[in-house]
């Protein structure tokens, strides 16, 4: 049996410079991006949210307190996506610990274009620059 506790995130990569929040299909891209960011001297902590509601705000806040920076990665459009809710929660619960504005790497604010899926999705090529920019803020 394999179960995932509802409302419990998992730190899947320890790091000290930037927290990267991801879930679902974007977790693997976040892991690739975190590894690539080490070439730029950035040590990422990757948190797999695993469930979005209830969200494990305590795990998110603990990681943001540790790193002072956060990048949220998800496939949905940036506007009204769940990443916006996460950033709002982080601002409410951990604002004083932020050393840089939270960043979101998301889909674009357009309908999902299946023929252009690889251009639409926030793959590591778009995630790494956001991580580096957030780390160097």
Label the predicted regions:
Residues 1-137:
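Thiamine diphosphate
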């Amino acid at each position: 049996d394999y179960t995932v506790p509802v409302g419990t995130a998992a730190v899947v990569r320890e790091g000290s410079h930037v927290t990267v929040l991801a879930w679902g299909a974007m977790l693997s891209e976040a892991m690739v991006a975190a590894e690539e960011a080490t070439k730029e001297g950035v040590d990422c902590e990757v948190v797999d949210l695993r469930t979005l509601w209830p969200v494990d705000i305590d795990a998110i806040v603990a990681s943001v307190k540790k790193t002072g920076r956060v990048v949220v990665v998800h496939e949905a459009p940036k506007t009204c996506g769940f990443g916006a809710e996460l950033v709002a929660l982080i601002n409410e619960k951990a604002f004083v610990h932020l050393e840089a504005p939270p960043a979101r790497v998301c889909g674009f604010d357009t309908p999902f274009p299946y023929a252009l899926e690889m251009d639409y999705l926030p793959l590591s090529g778009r995630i790494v620059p956001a991580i580096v920019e957030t780390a160097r803020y």
